[in-house]
């Protein structure tokens, strides 16, 4: 039943996106009326997925959520450098360097922060409106099949809302170990009031995201599902991640939260009717090709769900598109950093073999292949890539559990999980390590495993570790000083993006981040 309704929703995706564009604080007059029918709730829920691809507030392509999510999670770390400057006409001309060098502009034309802020609030409000409408309709319907599907729809909306709240809090808030009751996250309009609200605390934001993921896990069925839609396994996986983010620095771990990270990691792999696996051997090389049926991916956004198979702009940072004859001159300018090359065993590590390739543009450099999936011929001889953006997968959940076990002092269990990921990558198991030595190995393994998936930067921040680049992006000669290429979360508040000034002018209750 779910597949049927979501396919209907996707067919009407453009109309849904337009409806969601109207469902913003300045115009909510028709929302209640529109969401009074079951079919419209189905369409509105499907439209939320479409909003990952559509521009926020009718702005340009740079405001696509999945692009901004990637840039702010990946470019601010040390796996990628710019081997060439973005062209002056490029939408990344200012936004790419703004993230990479921690310039953190509050202008929407210069930073991806506005994209995350605007799109997050649009989707959070849309999901909240849907949940309110679902609860009303559930109370008034007597059709058992419709009730069952309303429960499922509530789970999907709760998952998406939790995901957006959690991600935005990491962008605009301080890490959880730093006064979470005092430091601010984002406004939480979970009642769908569409009113200007104050920012909630980081703790309140995390607790709301947890509540949403728990609702999703309770409402979504234990069955194999299309991983490009919200599902129970992804809900458990996100709970393992968020509790890990709350689990403190390795020097001062919080036992209760780390135990919850272990609990929900276990839940991810303990469902009766859904199979979640970490891909092994030859299967590993296909990890990023088909998220719909992949047993390791828990949740991913894919442009392939759209009738037009829209090109994924994240691909453009790392590889060519267009005519194959122009592959060596195509405009992509990101390459794998020497920092990352140094931590990889390029002879033995299957992740290097399967997921990197020599750059076609820059001799002696490498690019990631994680966004080379979904290749299709848009027209004669011209190729585009409708590759997925993975938000969470089973390989991460194993490493979540390994880190949580380490912080609980259960070194044997932590080492077992760490070695599970190492051995599937073709590396030898480790033994006889514990404490900070074990933590360092887990941290580096997360970097090897999750590079180019918008995770590494937040691993540095949530663990209070200084992020340092050994190699500068020399294409930007003005930004080779250390203040542009390292950040210490324990001494610098520039880990947070600024709230866009335009949003503060619209909502006088907002308090700007201070450095």
Briefly describe each language-model feature range.
Residues 1-14:
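Sec-dependent bacterial lipoprotein signal peptides
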Residues 26-32, 60-73, 77, 174-182, ...:
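Short, surface-exposed recognition loops and adjoining beta-strand edges that mediate ligand/DNA contacts
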Residues 141, 146-150, 171-208, 249-259:
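Short coil/linker segments at helix-helix boundaries
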Residues 16-76, 319-325, 331, 344-347, ...:
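Membrane-proximal, proline-rich intrinsically disordered regions
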Residues 38-41, 45, 50-63, 255-256, ...:
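Extended ligand-binding clefts on enzyme/binding-domain cores
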Residues 89-172, 215-225, 382-389, 408, ...:
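Conserved, well-structured interaction surfaces
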